[in-house]
Amino acid sequence: MAEKRNIFLIGPMGAGKSTIGRQLSQQLNMEFFDSDQEIEKRTGANISWVFDVEGEHGFRQREVKVIDELTKKQGIVLATGGGSVKFKENRNILSARGIVIYLETTIEKQLSRTKRDKKRPLLQSNISNRTVLENLAYERNPLYEEIADFKIQTDNQSAKSVAYSIIHLLEKM
């Protein structure tokens, strides 16, 4: 991989996008961004607050702007929010400006990885988390598949191992 192309990580919450993204950026000596953290930095508030005040649609509008700006940079690793693929504009931007890697995980692994996480607004409802995650998977998994250049299952690998797998895939390009 002579030139440093942008690498965009997509997938459901709990797939490891942020953790793997940090590993990948260190291994490849690339700048790392997390779209959710970038939104928090710009608003001065956490994601849950933005969801409460602006609703999911308001949050997604902010997300489109952040993703558009960040993906104009060169040689970055970007971990996107799980729902970023809901907007066609985001899917088009990600597809056009870099290599899209879908980090896939099972509902069981998502439940175990997110059970103590209070920063996930979509898991703060009265509906069971399993039901929420199943509904999100039904809605979003086809969208992840639509734009993914590569798909990697993250359930039984460490973040470091997944990062190395991604690097190996990129070297073959």
Curated annotation (Swiss-Prot):
Keywords: Amino-acid biosynthesis, Aromatic amino acid biosynthesis, ATP-binding, Cytoplasm, Kinase, Magnesium, Metal-binding, Nucleotide-binding, Transferase. One of its GO terms (biological process) is chorismate biosynthetic process. Binds 1 Mg(2+) ion per subunit. Its cofactor is Mg(2+). Belongs to the shikimate kinase family. PROSITE patterns: SHIKIMATE_KINASE. It catalyses: shikimate + ATP = 3-phosphoshikimate + ADP + H(+). PANTHER family: SHIKIMATE KINASE, SHIKIMATE KINASE 1, CHLOROPLASTIC. Substrate binds at D36, R60, G82, R140. The keyword RNA-binding does not apply. Mg(2+) binds at S18. ATP binds at G14, A15, G16, K17, S18, T19, R120, Q157. GO terms for cellular component: cytosol. InterPro entries: P-loop_NTPase (IPR027417), Shikimate/glucono_kinase (IPR031322), Shikimate_kinase/TSH1 (IPR000623), Shikimate_kinase_CS (IPR023000). Monomer. Its EC number is 2.7.1.71. This is Shikimate kinase. It is found in: Cytoplasm. GO terms for molecular function: ATP binding; magnesium ion binding; shikimate kinase activity. The gene is aroK. It comes from Buchnera aphidicola subsp. Schizaphis graminum (strain Sg). Catalyzes the specific phosphorylation of the 3-hydroxyl group of shikimic acid using ATP as a cosubstrate. Pathway: Metabolic intermediate biosynthesis; chorismate biosynthesis; chorismate from D-erythrose 4-phosphate and phosphoenolpyruvate: step 5/7.
